Amino acid sequence: MYRHGISSQRSWPLWTTIFIFLGVAAILGVTIGLLVHFLAVEKTYYYQGDFHISGVTYNDNCENAASQASTNLSKDIETKMLNAFQNSSIYKEYVKSEVIKLLPNANGSNVQLQLKFKFPPAEGVSMRTKIKAKLHQMLKNNMASWNAVPASIKLMEISKAASEMLTNNCCGRQVANSIITGNKIVNGKSSLEGAWPWQASMQWKGRHYCGASLISSRWLLSAAHCFAKKNNSKDWTVNFGIVVNKPYMTRKVQNIIFHENYSSPGLHDDIALVQLAEEVSFTEYIRKICLPEAKMKLSENDNVVVTGWGTLYMNGSFPVILQEDFLKIIDNKICNASYAYSGFVTDTMLCAGFMSGEADACQNDSGGPLAYPDSRNIWHLVGIVSWGDGCGKKNKPGVYTRVTSYRNWITSKTGL
C-alpha cells in the first residue's frame, strides 16, 4: 500500500524577509540613481554638418594652406555660427563650431562643419533638432550674400574619435591654445599638450640637438646648419610630443636634403628637408603645420610664436617640456641697423623678437618653427630658427630663414 506524503509549509524567518526587502530596495535605489545620473549629467556631443553654396567654387581640403578667399569665407561662417549660437536659447550648451573643409562640386561648393555641445543625454533628440534649426536660420538670414542654400543643411552626431579624425589631417590646427603671455623660451613657460603638434625634436645619437617642423606625414623642415657636420641620416631619429625624451612617436630618418646654396659662414639658405623612413600617423597631438603661399607677406609687429627645447639661457640647462613664446616681426631695416646686425640680414631672412631683448630662441632651438596664425587661428610656418647673437640680448633679436622665399624649392623636392 502506498502512502501519500504530507507536505508541510514553513514561513521565512522575519530577519530573512527584512534582508531580502532591503537588498531589493538597494538594487532599485542604485538602478534609479544610475539612471538619474545618466540622464542628468552633461556629456559632450560632436556633430558633423554640411551645406551647399551655389554658383561659386572653393577648394580648401584643409590639408594645405587655404586661399585668401576661402579663408575669408570660412572665417565669416565661423563668426556667424558663433554669434548665432551664443545668442540662442542653447547658448549654455554650445562649446565650439568650426569650418573643416570647402569642397567643390558641379554646382558650387560644399561646406563641412564640426560642432561641439555639452548637455544631458535625455536632451539628445531635441538638441539635435534645435542645432539644425539654428543653422538653417543662420543660412537663411545671414548667408544670402554667399549664396548659401538653407534647405541643403545636414547634421549628424559623430563620435569623439570621428571628430578628431576630421581635423587630424588638417594643417595648422591646435588641440589646445597657448596660455603664456609675454614670457620667453629663455626662462619661459612650458606649452600645453596639442598646442604645437607639428614641433619635432631632431635627436642625434639619442639626444636632442635641433628642432624641426612636420609639414606632411613624411617630411619635416629644419635648418641646414643642424646637419652640416652631422649628415649621416642613420645617426638621426625624430621624436614627437611635448616631453623631449618621452615621445608619443619616434621615426628614423631616411634622407636629409640641404639647400644647394647653403653657406656656413653667413648662414645663407639655411634650410634643409628631412625625409622620414616611415610615415607618421596623425593624431590630436601630432599634426602638420601649414606651409605659407610664396606671396604671403608679414608686416612689422605681426604676432608670431617660436617653440623649442633649446637652452633656457646661453650655455644654460635644457627644459624637459617644450617651451614657447610670442614674438613680434621686426622690419629688416631695423634689424640691419648699425647697432643691430649691420646689414647681415638678407631678404631671405626675417627677424623676430624685441629690440629690447625680452624674448628669443636659444641654443639647440635651431631648425624649429616660427609660426604665424591667420584670422582663423590656423598656423603657418613662416620662419626657421637660424641664428642670432647670444640669447635675448638687447638689439640682437633672433634671425630666421624666411620660408616664403623657399616655397618653390620645397615643392621641387617634396611636391608639397
Curated annotation (Swiss-Prot):
Bilayer topology term: Single-pass type II membrane protein
Record: glycosylation sites: 72, 107, 315
PROSITE patterns to which the protein is assigned, alphabetical: SEA, TRYPSIN_DOM, TRYPSIN_HIS
Main location class: membrane
Annotated SEA domain residues: 43-160
PANTHER family: ACROSIN-RELATED, HYALIN
Protein name: Transmembrane protease serine 11B
